[in-house]
Amino acid sequence: MTFCYPCRAFALLTRGFTSFMSGWPRIYYKLLNLPLSILVKSKSIPADPAPELGLDTSRPIMYVLPYNSKADLLTLRAQCLAHDLPDPLEPLEIDGTLLPRYVFIHGGPRVFTYYTPKEESIKLFHDYLDLHRSNPNLDVQMVPVSVMFGRAPGREKGEVNPPLRMLNGVQKFFAVLWLGRDSFVRFSPSVSLRRMADEHGTDKTIAQKLARVARMHFARQRLAAVGPRLPARQDLFNKLLASRAIAKAVEDEARSKKISHEKAQQNAIALMEEIAANFSYEMIRLTDRILGFTWNRLYQGINVHNAERVRQLAHDGHELVYVPCHRSHMDYLLLSYVLYHQGLVPPHIAAGINLNFWPAGPIFRRLGAFFIRRTFKGNKLYSTVFREYLGELFSRGYSVEYFVEGGRSRTGRLLDPKTGTLSMTIQAMLRGGTRPITLIPIYIGYEHVMEVGTYAKELRGATKEKESLPQMLRGLSKLRNLGQGYVNFGEPMPLMTYLNQHVPDWRESIDPIEAVRPAWLTPTVNNIAADLMVRINNAGAANAMNLCCTALLASRQRSLTREQLTEQLNCYLDLMRNVPYSTDSTVPSASASELIDHALQMNKFEVEKDTIGDIIILPREQAVLMTYYRNNIAHMLVLPSLMAAIVTQHRHISRDVLMEHVNVLYPMLKAELFLRWDRDELPDVIDALANEMQRQGLITLQDDELHINPSHSRTLQLLAAGARETLQRYAITFWLLSANPSINRGTLEKESRTVAQRLSVLHGINAPEFFDKAVFSSLVLTLRDEGYISDSGDAEPAETMKVYQLLAELITSDVRLTIESATQGEG
């Protein structure tokens, strides 16, 4: 009986309970709420609506829902009560007039269709607006709310109605029964009815317009949450085969390999099978349950920032391309999980072909992964099929995700971007007909990365182990306490706006048939990629682990007393809070002591106790691994660290000379760490940092000179140590250039790495990235761009020696002697 009674109740609700004030609806709501409280477990988006949406609970609030559903209304009520928002079932009393606190825009399909409340919603809007005409102090906040049970987009064929159509009572019952725990209540930013009344008037036509705009809002919101319908896979393949680009590539394949047209076409289909996703809503739901269970046991929290800007872009109809940094294989799952719980469609994800092994490959494919080879070179058919598939995803309106770094960072820093997929994204725009494409840079951070031990081995020369089921199981078996996770959405980059500003005539290159490569494409793609990396770093997340690792690795003994560590963390926190790296970066709100307690729970550090107090130690075997976490936020602290290094060395220095020194070294730092400031912004940033360092007592300012404060010299020295290894690396390369101005770039990179490895052994430098090939390659390219190396390949000895002398002052004498003697074959 308990099964059929709610069903009967759902059907009854459509037959005439329209008056809120009558006694029957009150009884009815109580009866209906009982099964709903058991069947429905919804979540609110955003997580805390009032502060995140700027709702003022001291002013009247009314709710607008897309269609008449008492189940939706009661689900909304539960979330409102949970978040201290007004009860939608309690009427609003305004100037002696009682009005319902909720409005249904549409009646929705019903078992019996004689009742059409459309006019009632318009009348209620008109009543609310009319009250604003008579009361100039009144300002009702109208909050649009969507309640969704399940989010299956449906298929393009074989379904007459989409699963998320407006449901009658019986249909709604089954939706709640099966999907009650896959539901969410989406609160939208409020609309001021006072502003509406003042700007547009209060007559009935305005009320009608308000209802019409609300209907459009809900339609867009549903599309943002559910996405477009999914094609039958074979239909998608047939459409791709029929495209002119693939048809031509098939002909070229048959001719170049001297095979039949049918065989060439089979090759194309095989590539589609290799590449294409096989998206399944059922797999998304199942994985969401598993991940929800897993995250709750492995992570102490997933911190998400700036998701509202992404939801708004999806609502406005943008084609979203998520471009996260790549730390771990966990990124794929974490980002899709976060997006799903933010009320957004999980994207189609470009995954490396190395992940296409059983059983991970089929699972990832059903979660939206499409697979990409490491290189397209020498395979025109493959590149054409992949490009056309990506373009088809865009044209159909699916969100897409790819890692612009091309692979996981082994050092914790951002890698130089790989631009192939980004180039294809812009080429898709040049086909015309797509919605506006917006790139969303995303910073993903962890307090524990499960692959970090493997990364350290690979950086020291070990062969990368091929991904496989046994390797995956070994990794999963090691998962324990992973601490906190961080997903920060950076500043979006609308591609159309970018191209309009930087390539005003880009539309002249549009070709709906062929993929084009205009002359401006490559430099523009390179600039966009570099800008994306800067925006990813702008959204960096400081946390307990990376802050503690930064401080302990700065100590030559990798150990500090608890008091010293607390003081150092306070230094970092105050710098980041009072001179924020960017408006998108995040800093913990917890105190330094609380962060240390949390970091100690991660079991990465040792604590020795004596009669004086605690000493916190980073064990030698952990030191190499912990550089990964330090490097996650190196960009956020490198400028104050460089300033501290210069002041520490000189004891006192004028602002102008400090600025000159920073100006010389900044281009290398900017290129290596994707720093956000241009050179002309540096004076203001350095002034702000100097003032903050003075406020902390690290330095004193006298007659426009910065002086070291002896009473806080340890904190300043630990801050300066954050730039120590970077300056040593630069010194190696500039010394080699000065000693041999005609050295070619390849040899310069190789010899720089050799000296760095020697330095690492002799001076106990634990950072694997210290002699990473990619780091020196990037540095040498920057030296060419900055004019230290001419187009002919020769260095400018006077300039390089001047920079080396500056660097030599900032490194210790024993390190300097090792560098200078290494080129002479001495030890």
UniProtKB/Swiss-Prot annotation:
Reaction(s) the record says it catalyses: sn-glycerol 3-phosphate + an acyl-CoA = a 1-acyl-sn-glycero-3-phosphate + CoA
Pathway the protein takes part in: Phospholipid metabolism; CDP-diacylglycerol biosynthesis; CDP-diacylglycerol from sn-glycerol 3-phosphate: step 1/3
GO biological process: CDP-diacylglycerol biosynthetic process; fatty acid metabolic process
Domain of life (superkingdom): Bacteria
GO cellular component, one term: plasma membrane
Membrane topology value: Peripheral membrane protein
EC number(s) recorded for this UniProt protein: 2.3.1.15
UniProt GO molecular function: glycerol-3-phosphate O-acyltransferase activity
The protein's enzyme class: transferase
Cell inner membrane recorded as keyword: yes
UniProt short sequence motif HXXXXD motif, positions renumbered to this chain: 325-330
Keyword Thylakoid: no
Main location as per UniProt: membrane
Compartment(s) of residence: Cell inner membrane
Swiss-Prot/TrEMBL keywords: Acyltransferase, Cell inner membrane, Cell membrane, Lipid biosynthesis, Lipid metabolism, Membrane, Phospholipid biosynthesis, Phospholipid metabolism, Transferase
HAMAP family (alphabetical): Glyc3P_acyltrans
Domains: entry comment: The HXXXXD motif is essential for acyltransferase activity and may constitute the binding site for the phosphate moiety of the glycerol-3-phosphate.
Family affiliation: Belongs to the GPAT/DAPAT family.
Name recorded for this polypeptide: Glycerol-3-phosphate acyltransferase
Organism for this UniProt entry: Shigella boydii serotype 4 (strain Sb227)
